[in-house]
Regions:
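Outer-membrane beta-barrel proteins
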Residues: 1-258
């Protein structure tokens, strides 16, 4: 991808695999090594990644207001499928949607906006994105626009940092289009995927740091029916104990995850 840095005016990026604006916000809790999605996937890591390619991303510089350091990130894609195209080519809206999301049809524009505020040891960030779903193949069971969002808060005091984050992902698909017995995948299933993470990290000294992270990922079908078949919510719990040691140019990092 290509980036244009404009000094005090910020940075504009475009191309493939830019990371979009969401990479600054998803799973953003203190960790000694890696996010909990490094060993397995969770919905928080997916939030906003449909804007990773075919998009224009703007990152503002930091500016101070009443002692608070603020920054903003904005992104726009005319074809928000997260799939890149070669020089002189374009992605096909129909086949790209099938490949990326498994639902057929097409989709349109995508928008994303994030903001970060820092005050002394406290950092707060929030991001949200929306993507148009336009699927003419579903007839009466029309889809609606998808929404994905995440927020986090971190606080550092001396060698100790704590953090908490929540994410929300609604693909906008209709429950009638997904069989009850079908495995519920992110962006292929109706309902809502939500996640919450909390962590604590400790810098033992300038070379050694450790952290503990707990993540709970929940799928809610949103059927909420008094009759017929109710699809039970499913929750995935994961924990990670991490350690990192560095000495000069050498570093050793490891984690144990369940």
């Amino acid at each position: 991808y290509t980036s244009l840095t404009m000094g005090s005016l910020g940075t504009i990026s475009t191309g493939t695999d830019t990371g979009g604006a969401s990479y600054k916000y998803d799973e953003e809790v203190p960790q000694a090594y890696e996010q909990t999605s490094d060993a397995q996937q969770n919905s928080a890591n997916i939030v906003g990644n449909q804007m990773d390619s075919n998009s224009i991303v703007y990152n503002s510089p930091s500016f101070d207001i009443a002692g608070i350091s603020l920054s903003m990130d904005a992104e726009y894609s005319p074809n928000a499928n997260g799939i890149g195209a070669g020089d002189g080519a374009e992605t096909d809206k129909v086949t790209a949607f099938v490949a990326a999301d498994g639902q057929g049809g097409n989709f349109g524009k995508g928008y994303g906006l994030g903001a970060t505020a820092k005050y002394q040891g406290l950092t707060f960030g929030a991001y949200g994105s929306e993507r148009e779903n336009n699927d003419p193949t579903l007839g009466a069971t029309k889809v609606r626009d998808a929404f994905e969002g995440v927020w986090y808060a971190k606080y550092s005091m001396g060698p100790v940092s704590v953090g908490y984050s929540e994410s929300y992902l609604d693909s906008g698909l209709n429950a009638a289009d997904v069989a009850i017995t079908t495995a519920k995948g992110i962006r292929t299933a109706s309902g809502i995927f939500s996640s919450e993470s909390m962590s604590i990290a400790f810098n033992v000294n300038e070379n050694l740091s450790v952290s503990y992270t707990s993540t709970e990922d929940t799928y809610d079908d949103q059927s909420n029916t008094n009759g017929g078949v109710e699809v039970a919510d499913v929750t995935q719990d994961s924990t990670a104990l991490q350690i990192a040691y560095s000495m000069g140019a050498m570093s050793v990092k490891a984690y144990q995850m369940e």
